[in-house]
Structure formats: C-alpha cells, structure tokens
Amino acid sequence: GLYRLAEQYEDWCEGTKPFFVHDYHFNYFQVGVESLGEPFFDENGVCFSSAFRRVWEPYARAALKGGVWLQGGYATEPLRTGDSIVSVASSASILYYSTTVTYADNTTEEVEIKALPCPVFEDGKKLVMQRGAGVCTVKSTPEREEACMVFLKWLTDPQKNVEFVTQLGYMPVKQEAFDVYLPKALAGIEDPMYRSLYEAFLKTQEEYEFYTAPQRTDYLKLETDFEQDIRDTLNLCRKKYVETIAEAPELPVWEALERFEMTFSQ
C-alpha cells in the first residue's frame, strides 16, 4: 500500500526525503476510521477506538521512518522543491502545483503530475471527504437579493458550472453536471494535469461515497489541536528513534500513539 511504499522509498533514499505529504492529517484519520465502520467522534471529542489504531499503525510506521512530511504548510510546497513526490490534498490545490521542480541548488526538472482517486484502506469502504463552502446572501435591497439569486442560478447551471469548475479544480455541484457535461468537457481539457484530475473525479463519483464532517461547535478546535499535536508527537518520536536506533531498532509505533493520546486529551 501507500505507506509501505513510503517506507521502501525511505530505505531507497536513505531517509533523506519524505515520500508522502497529507495536507489534512485530521481528515485522513476521520475518513479512515469511518470507512472501517466505526465513529471517529464521540461526545467528548475524538474516539480512540480499535479502528483508530488500525488507521494509526501504517501512518505512524511510515512517519517514524521519515516517509511522511510532518512540517507545516501545504503539499504543493515540498512537491515544487522535490522534497516529496506524492500528496493527498484538496482538488483545488491543482491551481498551485507546478510541473517544474526547483531543487535546492537551483537546478530544475520537468515532471508530470497525475491525479488519482483518494487512496482507501484495503478492508474499508471507498469513502472520501467532501469539503466545500456554501454560498449565502446577506440582507440587502430586494434588487440586490434578486440579482444574487439570478447569479447563483447561472453559476450552478450544469453546463455553465462545468465550464467554470474545470478551470479551477473544483467539483461540479449537480448530478447532471457529472453525468452529462463533465464527460463531454474532458475532451476539451488540454492540460494533462487537469484532465487527469477530472478523470479521477468521474471515477470517484462513480465508485466512492462522500463523507461530510459533522456540525460540532468544537470541530475547529479539535482539528487545530489534532493537526498540531500529531505532527509534534511524531516529530519528537522520530528524532528519539533516530538517536537510539542502534540500541532500539523497533519503531515506537504504539509508544507514539500513547504519547499522542495523552497530549491531545489534555
């Protein structure tokens, strides 16, 4: 799988560059746990269930070996500099990807960027996070409110919507757009990077279920704390592992989980 490949990549490059960047660690765990049939959230916050441990193990193993990017920022940054080569990110990130990699010595190399449906667990259902923002109006004059409605109807018209989203990396908003207009639009997309993204969209729409995060008053805090704590924990545990690998060659996967649970639950 993806994380086993990340470990192999680290062996190949002798631990100098992480193979994989995930823009949203919180989403990886959230969707991963839910895809295995268990709830990610409980009344107190995050539920550290058996499914959480299942999702944790391959991720932590790869991260502790150096195969997962644990610094801040978005995936587009290490991909532009060749510091990583694979990412899971928002579809709209395509606006920021570059087919030219610029290395630390200022040399450059052209690369091909290909989009694929989001990876899933072998024993889980095909589930993918749907993150999107709605559009709303504020109280105004009747004329402005009517103008806003006319604009939204125009923007979400299936044909117009496909013309718009295929320039920006967004998903169409109506089923008719997926069924009728997006397949037709593919033939006119000249950029192979964008074409592969929308081919992946069609496959995702056909084969996956979409997961939307629950409405919780503490959601933003849980997400912010989780992202920071998990990176800090794994960075610390990896540093300790590298320093003591001669005496303790076993990856501290479960020690890292215990430390993360303690830190996150404080």
Report each predicted region and the residues it spans.
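Extracytoplasmic/periplasmic substrate-recognition and gating elements
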Residues: 61-67, 104-177
